[in-house]
Amino acid sequence: MEYKVLALGDVASETGLQLLEKKLRAFKKEHDVRFTVVNGENISGSGLTKAQAEALFAAGADVITLGNHTFGKPQIAAYLDEERYILRPANFTGRAPGHGYQMVDCGAFSVAVLVLIGRCDLDFNAENPFTTADKLLKAQTDKPTFTLVEFHAGATSEKLAMAYYLDGRVSALWGTHTHVPTADMQVFPKGTGYVTDLGMTGPIRSVLGIRPEQSVEFFLGGLPGRYQAAEGPCSAQGCIFALNSDTGLCEKVDRIEMK
């Protein structure tokens, strides 16, 4: 049987969150989406608050993922230990609060979600994402119907290499972090659905979610300052993965944009 999974790119502002509060549930119903993963690490610019996480769950997210801005709001650390459906990268060092892998029982099917962070182009102290994926996948005792991997990374080569490495072992793998949607949606030879980057949920007229004039000023040689979220209409970018419960693999990947 086919089940549709929706993955949405980094929510880059409060206005991006507001868009999801208004549109997400109706969109899921219209497209028969059964499971939704949303990257929420940029709602506050850098980081996520407990109130924002609760609002995102209420809007229709089943799992919230985080990346290099996981601890942008330090107070989230304690919440990560108690909220099992907010996932930070699994290859953070062992002392980091929270967890990066979770099994979700959806009744008719089960989903395992794994979050990893890349080591190319990211100044972050993390363990090898490839060996971390191996370790966690091999440790699966109750085999889920589907396994989903979010790879929060800057380098396309690292994301593609991970997709080839995990092809046939996971249902879908998507990238986040760059805030720019890529057009390489595909199903790999052994059945893993893939896209290099989901894109962003945030202001359309922006530079990766921030006010264009602030970014222009920075590149003109201005002093670094506190960036502010851009204003105006928003869109939510991502992909729908059509997964087969008989094989646990992907049959189709479609790009979506919600406005």
Residue ranges of each PLM-predicted region?
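Acidic, metal/ion-coordinating pockets
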Residues: 1-259
